[in-house]
């Protein structure tokens, strides 16, 4: 496959044009008065959104050189979204400004390597300053303000604060589509999984068609149980110990005589047991069973660890305060597992989340984490049309991510003002000289861009606003929604510091790489082959 090359200034200018095309598309959405972007979809209705990363993912530029620049900025938005879940538009605007300012200096003869050093030092100093000025949040009202600002909707803010309050900061909040118009909150306490009873005869509450077990024993078996001979020794021990105590059996499957024996005993009233299938498949099933075991103080019975069902005693059984089993779901509330073991398991899952590259794996691990940490909240969202529903769901997901980030590292004043104040630490160019000092100055000039575009989108003169904000004290800034200057934290205009910090760090990372680029290599487009049968040889028919 032949390649075509572009060198030096030409190469960098082409990259910059690509960066600008993508950033100009995204930056119309920034701020409370930002606009939306409509994205055509091959199938179904178009998507209307103001989410930077969603827009960035859809942009492909025709010119292959420019497309390289656009793809690099897409990386900024995606990475910021992965780390902080929001702030993707801010990151894109910063990347564009850093590239523009940096390339001016490279064209004027500055050394790209020294510029990069200056930019890196400046970003580190600004990040440190942002973290130092961040205010931790634990008040419900603060959480509501962060979420409301991200989703641009007060009701959403209050709902997310309510959900956070219920599940704690490690709990999972998921967003589902509903058939009604408004927003609803559903809370499931304890560990729930999507498998119900294997036979309707297990039901204890006929009206609600559910089996409720108070203070039960819990048996977790990795394989299938089909022969009653395997189960009988343990059942006898349970009945001897406490005949009135119910038993929940979680296994890959329970069939044949093993199931029928349990059902017969239940109907006769001699013994109350409920059997459910284990959730998930393969390795994920093993991991989920182990989670349940840790939560309830049970031991997973499997051949792998040398445990056989017909040889174990009561010590392998776990307990919980209450278990509710419906046709489709099982919920374990207040498992009797040891606190430190549960914490250890939570830490292990958190480490796995940090190390995974797959979004799907990360989502599944988050779910497991929440189930261990004590609950799941589902926010159900509805809308009049499919297009509006997608847009609302997206805004909700962003707001949840922003709120998590805020709880983790704290908040700074929003509306782009935190960066304007934070770059004041760069005033002496950090004692750098020459091209490194120029690199520091590049960051100083670029950092005002998010505020500038928030103002421009509100129909105002951007640079006038940025210089006014720079003269104010820390925490003060411009509120584009009301058009007033003042204490932004009090006004509820706040950003999670993690979002602002990640946006700047990721933008600088890509921009400084782009400045040090000298050559572009792209594949040559192959000429279209003429369609077969296109040559006429003049045969008369």
Curated annotation (Swiss-Prot):
<dbReference type="InterPro" id="IPR027410">
    <property type="entry name" value="TCP-1-like_intermed_sf"/>
</dbReference>
<comment type="function">
    <text>Together with its co-chaperonin GroES, plays an essential role in assisting protein folding. The GroEL-GroES system forms a nano-cage that allows encapsulation of the non-native substrate proteins and provides a physical environment optimized to promote and accelerate protein folding.</text>
</comment>
<dbReference type="InterPro" id="IPR018370">
    <property type="entry name" value="Chaperonin_Cpn60_CS"/>
</dbReference>
<dbReference type="GO" id="GO:0051085">
    <property type="term" value="P:chaperone cofactor-dependent protein refolding"/>
</dbReference>
<keyword id="KW-0067">ATP-binding</keyword>
<comment type="similarity">
    <text>Belongs to the chaperonin (HSP60) family.</text>
</comment>
<keyword id="KW-0547">Nucleotide-binding</keyword>
<protein>
    <recommendedName>
        <fullName>Chaperonin GroEL 1</fullName>
        <ecNumber>5.6.1.7</ecNumber>
    </recommendedName>
</protein>
<dbReference type="GO" id="GO:0009408">
    <property type="term" value="P:response to heat"/>
</dbReference>
<feature type="binding site">
    <location>
        <position position="415"/>
    </location>
    <ligand>
        <name>ATP</name>
    </ligand>
</feature>
<feature type="binding site">
    <location>
        <begin position="479"/>
        <end position="481"/>
    </location>
    <ligand>
        <name>ATP</name>
    </ligand>
</feature>
<feature type="binding site">
    <location>
        <begin position="86"/>
        <end position="90"/>
    </location>
    <ligand>
        <name>ATP</name>
    </ligand>
</feature>
<keyword id="KW-0963">Cytoplasm</keyword>
<dbReference type="InterPro" id="IPR027409">
    <property type="entry name" value="GroEL-like_apical_dom_sf"/>
</dbReference>
<feature type="binding site">
    <location>
        <position position="495"/>
    </location>
    <ligand>
        <name>ATP</name>
    </ligand>
</feature>
<dbReference type="GO" id="GO:1990220">
    <property type="term" value="C:GroEL-GroES complex"/>
</dbReference>
<dbReference type="GO" id="GO:0005524">
    <property type="term" value="F:ATP binding"/>
</dbReference>
<dbReference type="GO" id="GO:0042026">
    <property type="term" value="P:protein refolding"/>
</dbReference>
<dbReference type="GO" id="GO:0140662">
    <property type="term" value="F:ATP-dependent protein folding chaperone"/>
</dbReference>
<keyword id="KW-0143">Chaperone</keyword>
<dbReference type="InterPro" id="IPR001844">
    <property type="entry name" value="Cpn60/GroEL"/>
</dbReference>
<comment type="subunit">
    <text>Forms a cylinder of 14 subunits composed of two heptameric rings stacked back-to-back. Interacts with the co-chaperonin GroES.</text>
</comment>
<dbReference type="Pfam" id="PF00118">
    <property type="entry name" value="Cpn60_TCP1"/>
</dbReference>
<dbReference type="GO" id="GO:0016853">
    <property type="term" value="F:isomerase activity"/>
</dbReference>
<dbReference type="GO" id="GO:0051082">
    <property type="term" value="F:unfolded protein binding"/>
</dbReference>
<dbReference type="InterPro" id="IPR002423">
    <property type="entry name" value="Cpn60/GroEL/TCP-1"/>
</dbReference>
<feature type="binding site">
    <location>
        <begin position="29"/>
        <end position="32"/>
    </location>
    <ligand>
        <name>ATP</name>
    </ligand>
</feature>
<keyword id="KW-0413">Isomerase</keyword>
<dbReference type="InterPro" id="IPR027413">
    <property type="entry name" value="GROEL-like_equatorial_sf"/>
</dbReference>
